[in-house]
Every structure is written in structure tokens, then in C-alpha cells.
Amino acid sequence: MSEKTTPSINELLDREAIRNLIISFNALGDRGRVAEMIQVFAPDATLKAVGQTAVGRADIATLLQANPLLPDHQVTRHHIGTQTVEISGDEAVARSYFSVLTNIGLDHHGVYIDHFRRQPGGAWLIVEREVRLDWQAANSVYAPLPVHDRARPQVSAGFPKMPNA
């Protein structure tokens, strides 16, 4: 939150709009509705996931459709947990922990690191998303996915990030 002790109504509305984008992405993905999923991204957005990078909605759709699909009769449900949203003017950054449940139970979990920009009409869209996978079950229904190496600290702006970040 900003230095203010009480957020404004507009800031609260912005936070809720951003959270709704994150949740919508997962709900649509669980139903396989890729054409609608990509609408949460700005036209020139970047998605970094499963060791690949896609730029623009068309490439993002291709990446999402190319991911290992669940076998027939499998169920997948993405759940958002702890979440932070920091807003600065017309830009925002969110970190959202996620867990994915399938027919085996907990299948994998990680964090979304999202950058948002308010569009000219006032709507928020994702301009960059990094999907960082922290763990995947040995019996996952998905093909093996690249898991983030939490043992190596990441360096950003000259300061090492905490290994557990």
C-alpha cells in the first residue's frame, strides 16, 4: 500500500479489478477457454511460462494451447492464495501464490508475478506475467514442468532477493 494509512475508494476499486483479472485468467483456463483468457493481457503483453516466452496475444494463445493438456476425464482447478498488489499511478505489480489441484490432489504450485497497466478506457490489463513454478508432484497429470530453483538467490536492482521470495 502507499504511505497513506487509509486507501481511497478508487485504489480499492483498482485492487479489486486487478484481482478479478488474475482470478478470471484461472477460471477461464480451467475451462479451456483460451480465446477469452488472452483478453486479460494487453495486446503487446509478455508471458513467461514453462521455460518459454510469448509476446503479444496471438503468441500467448499459441503458448497456452501448446501446454501439456490434461488427459481425458481429468479435472484441474487453480486456486489463488496469498496475494499482494502495489499500485503506482497507472501501473501495478501483483504477486499471487497459486495451487493447482487435479485428480491426484495437489499437482503443482508456484507464484504469478504480474505487471499491469491501466488502459486509456480505465481498464487494467496484464502487460507482463511470469509464472514461477515452485513444486510439481512426482505423479503430476501434467508433463514435467521447469521448477524454479529457489536455492539460488535472484539479483534485482543490485539487491539479492531472498531465496524464499
Question: Language model features by range: what are they?
Answer:
Residues 15, 24-28, 94-99, 104-109:
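A structural preference for long, well-packed, hydrophobic secondary-structure segments
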Residues 1-35, 39, 43:
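Short, low-complexity N-terminal intrinsically disordered segments enriched in polar/charged residues
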Residues 137-165:
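Acidic/histidine-enriched, glycine/proline-rich intrinsically disordered or flexible terminal extensions
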Residues 34-98:
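A solvent-exposed, acidic/Ser-Thr-rich amphipathic alpha-helical stretch
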Residues 93, 111-145:
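Short beta-strand edge/turn micro-motifs at domain boundaries
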Residues 55, 100-102, 132-133:
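Short, surface-exposed beta-strand-loop junctions and turns on beta-sheet-rich folds
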Residues 80-85, 100, 111-118:
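Hydrophobic/aromatic beta-strand elements that line small-molecule binding cavities or substrate pockets
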Residues 18, 68, 87-93, 100, ...:
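A structural signal for the main folded, soluble domain(s) of proteins
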